[in-house]
C-alpha cells in the first residue's frame, strides 16, 4: 500500500510565518479540516500537519494557492527526512518516493528564502543528475505524469522535505518567487509591485483585453510614478493624483495628467478602466475609499495596497477583506476579490478587485 502524505507545506516571506499560520488555522477551521501549524520564526515556511484521517490532497484542493494571502507556494508533503547520511542522501529520498507511489514530470530542489539556506545550492547541483537518473530508472520520473512536480525542500544539508505540486494550483517559479527585472527608466522600485500584481491576478491571455492601450486609469498617490510607469507602458492614459512631483519622462509621454489633489477625495470625470493605489494610510481608510469607487462605479478593476500593522496582520487583512466583500454585496455588486502578499511587498498586501457585471 502506498504511503499517503498528511502535511501541507507552504512557503512565505521570512518573518511572516505567524501570519500564514493564523491564516491557515482560520481557513482550515472554516473548511472543517483539522490540523495544526509548525513554524519557526524567520524560517520562510510553514508545515501544516493534518489529522491522520485527512488526506493532504483534499485540503490542498479545498484551499488553493490563489485563495491564500501569505503563501508563496502550496504543496502536498511528507514529514521531513532528517539526519541524512552525508555519504548517501539519495537512498532515503528515493525510497520515500517509491513508497509513495508518486510519479512526476519534473523535479525542483528549493530552499527557504534565507541567506543560510541559499548556501545549499552546491549540494542541490551535485545531487540533481544522480537523483533524476535514479528516479527515471525506478519509474517515478516520467515524460507524462499529468504535469505533477516533485519538490525537494532543503532546510539543511541533512534535512529535506519531499512534496508534490499540481498544475493549476501552484506557483510556477522556484521558491514561489517571480524573477522580474527592474526597468532602469522607472521612477521607483515600487513599479515591480504592480507588474507582479498583474502577473498574479490577471491571466496572461487576458492582458490584450484587460490591460490595453485603449484604456484609462487613475493612480492615487502616484508620485513619483512607479505605478504610473506600468500603466503608461501598457499604453493607458493616466490620471496621476498626488501633491508630490511626478517623473519628468512620464509627463513627457503625453499619457499622464498630473492633478495635485487628495487621492482620498478626488473623483474621476468618467468611469475608468483601472484604479491603482499605493497610498500609505490606515488599511480601513483605504478600504472605505476603494469601496466608494467600486459602488459608484468609477472603475472596472482595482489594484491597491493595504499597509499592515506589526502584530495580528492576518486579523487586519481578514477584517478588511470581509468589510469590502460585505459592502459590495449589500450594494448588489458582484465582484471577484483576491489578496496576496507579493514577493515585492514588504509590510503590506496587494488586493485585486474585478467587477463581474
UniProtKB/Swiss-Prot annotation:
| Subunit description | Monomer.
Q: What is this protein called?
A: Ribosomal RNA large subunit methyltransferase M
The record ties this protein, via HAMAP family, to: 23SrRNA_methyltr_M
Query: Per its database record, what is this protein's job?
Result: Catalyzes the 2'-O-methylation at nucleotide C2498 in 23S rRNA.
* Catalytic-site annotation from UniProt: 307
Per its record, the protein catalyses: cytidine(2498) in 23S rRNA + S-adenosyl-L-methionine = 2'-O-methylcytidine(2498) in 23S rRNA + S-adenosyl-L-homocysteine + H(+)
Q: Which InterPro entries match?
A: RlmM_FDX, RlmM_THUMP-like, RNA_MeTrfase_FtsJ_dom, rRNA_MeTrfase_M, SAM-dependent_MTases_sf
Q: What is its EC number?
A: 2.1.1.186
Return the SUPFAM superfamilies for the record: S-adenosyl-L-methionine-dependent methyltransferases
GO biological process terms, alphabetically, are:
methylation; rRNA processing
Q: What are the subcellular locations of this protein?
A: Cytoplasm
Which residues take part in binding S-adenosyl-L-methionine?
Answer: 190, 223-226, 242, 262, 278
Q: Which UniProt keywords apply?
A: Cytoplasm, Methyltransferase, rRNA processing, S-adenosyl-L-methionine, Transferase
What family, per the record?
Belongs to the class I-like SAM-binding methyltransferase superfamily. RNA methyltransferase RlmE family. RlmM subfamily.
Output the Gene Ontology cellular-component terms: cytoplasm
From the record, give the transmembrane residue ranges. none
Amino acid at each position: 500500500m502506498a504511503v499517503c502524505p498528511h502535511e501541507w507545506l507552504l512557503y512565505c516571506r521570512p518573518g511572516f510565518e505567524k501570519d500564514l499560520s493564523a491564516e491557515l488555522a482560520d481557513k482550515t477551521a472554516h473548511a472543517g479540516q483539522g490540523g495544526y501549524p509548525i513554524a519557526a520564526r524567520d524560517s520562510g515556511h510553514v508545515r501544516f500537519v493534518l489529522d491522520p484521517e485527512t488526506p493532504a490532497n483534499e485540503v490542498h484542493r479545498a484551499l488553493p494557492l490563489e485563495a491564500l494571502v501569505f503563501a508563496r507556494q502550496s504543496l502536498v508533503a511528507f514529514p521531513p527526512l532528517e539526519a541524512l547520511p552525508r555519504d548517501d542522501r539519495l537512498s532515503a529520498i528515493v525510497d520515500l518516493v517509491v513508497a509513495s507511489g508518486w510519479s512526476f514530470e519534473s523535479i525542483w530542489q528549493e530552499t527557504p528564502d534565507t541567506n543560510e539556506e541559499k548556501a545549499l545550492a552546491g549540494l542541490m547541483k551535485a545531487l540533481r543528475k544522480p537523483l533524476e537518473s535514479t528516479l527515471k530508472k525506478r519509474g517515478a520520473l516520467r515524460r507524462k505524469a499529468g504535469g505533477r512536480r516533485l519538490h525537494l525542500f532543503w532546510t539543511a544539508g541533512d534535512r529535506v522535505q519531499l512534496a508534490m505540486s499540481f498544475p493549476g494550483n501552484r506557483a510556477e517559479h522556484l521558491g514561489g518567487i517571480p524573477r522580474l527585472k527592474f526597468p532602469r527608466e522607472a521612477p521607483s522600485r515600487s513599479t515591480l509591485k504592480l507588474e507582479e500584481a498583474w502577473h498574479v491576478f490577471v491571466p496572461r491571455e487576458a492582458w490584450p483585453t484587460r490591460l490595453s492601450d485603449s484604456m484609462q486609469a487613475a493612480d492615487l498617490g502616484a508620485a513619483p510614478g512607479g505605478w504610473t510607469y506600468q500603466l503608461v507602458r501598457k499604453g493607458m492614459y493616466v490620471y496621476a493624483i498626488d501633491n508630490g512631483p511626478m517623473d519628468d519622462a512620464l509627463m513627457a509621454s503625453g499619457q499622464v495628467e498630473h492633478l495635485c489633489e487628495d487621492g482620498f477625495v478626488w473623483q474621476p470625470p468618467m468611469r475608468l478602466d483601472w484604479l491603482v493605489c499605493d497610498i500609505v494610510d490606515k488599511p480601513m481608510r483605504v478600504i472605505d475609499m476603494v469601496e466608494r469607487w467600486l459602488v459608484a462605479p468609477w472603475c472596472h478593476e482595482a489594484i491597491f495596497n493595504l499597509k499592515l500593522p506589526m502584530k495580528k496582520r492576518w486579523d487586519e487583512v481578514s477584517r478588511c477583506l470581509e468589510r469590502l466583500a460585505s459592502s459590495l454585496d449589500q450594494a448588489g455588486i458582484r465582484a471577484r476579490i483576491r489578496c496576496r502578499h507579493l514577493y515585492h511587498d514588504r509590510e503590506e498586501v496587494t488586493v485585486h478587485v474585478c467587477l463581474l457585471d
